[in-house]
């Protein structure tokens, strides 16, 4: 495992950086594909100074020194956070350090997607093989003037993430703080309760879909188990929906959006 992190202040200025790499545990088999993507080799995996446990100890110590903070990376919620949680759990450490004890987590990829939902030309992009705009970090960094030859090493990817986000911050200064509000579940829930209309941006197979929604009354339309608020897609005729029977409404709810 290799990890790289940069501590920033509220103005996005660097305060400190941290990087560490450990030897591969003897019970693990390396992936040849991962070695190629990360420009690594067997020597780097087997001859590092730190054991797996020692490195995780350093990571936990550094995370606690930097807390409370907003932890974010590029596609980190779906990948990096899950790796950290699993490795911390297996080494008998608290796995949810990035979103407890005053910390919150966010994902730079989601901020980039939100920025494009507001302004489709906020950053230069290229098309992927499916004809959609590529949201890959290396692609965005390269096309917007940042050196990306070292992409896929941990600390270098962190540097690229900071540069891409800082460019969005410069181009959309008024919206910058709004993007970070979505790091808090409580703030998002309150926004939905207070606003009469809000927009949801979802990604399916690399394509952005925007939905204009209106929240339903919380006293009657909360999820029975998870207590999530529910809303209606305003593309559809609300009056027609209101006239549906309970069984017909259930059928409509199960259809693909």
Language model: regions and residue ranges:
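Short, solvent-exposed loop/turn segments at secondary-structure junctions
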Residues: 77-79, 111, 237
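A general structural signal for short secondary-structure junctions and capping/turn motifs
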Residues: 62-63, 152, 219-224
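Alpha-helix capping at helix-to-loop junctions
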Residues: 61, 65-68, 89-93, 111-121, ...
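Conserved non-catalytic scaffold segment of RNase H-like nuclease domains
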Residues: 1-93, 134, 139-144, 242-257
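A mobile, often basic/glycine-rich helix-loop segment
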Residues: 92-101
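Acidic, Mg2+-coordinating catalytic module of metal-dependent nucleases/exonucleases
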Residues: 70-77, 83, 120-186
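Active-site-proximal helix-loop-helix substrate-binding element of RNase H-like nuclease domains
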Residues: 24-38, 42-46, 103-158
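Acidic two-metal-ion nuclease catalytic site recognized across multiple nuclease folds
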Residues: 166-257
């Amino acid at each position: 495992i290799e990890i790289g992190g940069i501590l920033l202040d509220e103005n996005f200025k660097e305060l400190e950086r941290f990087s560490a790499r450990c030897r591969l545990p003897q019970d693990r088999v390396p992936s040849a594909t991962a070695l190629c993507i990360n420009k690594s080799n067997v020597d780097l995996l087997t001859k590092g100074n730190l054991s797996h446990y020692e490195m995780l100890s350093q990571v936990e110590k550094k995370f606690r020194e930097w807390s409370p903070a907003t932890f974010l990376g590029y596609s980190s919620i779906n990948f990096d956070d899950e790796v950290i949680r699993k490795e911390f759990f297996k080494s008998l450490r608290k796995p949810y350090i990035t979103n407890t004890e005053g910390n919150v987590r966010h994902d730079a990829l989601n901020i980039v997607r939100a920025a494009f939902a507001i302004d489709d030309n906020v950053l230069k992009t290229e098309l992927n093989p499916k004809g959609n705009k590529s949201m890959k970090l290396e692609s965005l960094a390269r096309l917007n003037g940042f050196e990306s030859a070292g992409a896929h090493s941990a600390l270098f990817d962190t540097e690229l993430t900071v540069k891409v986000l800082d460019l969005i911050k410069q181009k959309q200064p008024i919206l910058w703080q709004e993007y970070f509000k979505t790091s808090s579940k409580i703030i998002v829930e309150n926004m939905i309760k207070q606003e009469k209309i809000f927009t949801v941006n979802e990604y399916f197979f690399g394509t952005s879909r925007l939905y204009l929604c209106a929240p339903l009354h919380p006293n009657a339309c909360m999820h029975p188990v998870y207590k999530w608020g529910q809303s209606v897609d305003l593309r559809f005729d609300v009056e027609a929906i209101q006239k549906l029977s309970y069984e017909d409404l259930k059928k409509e709810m199960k259809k693909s959006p």
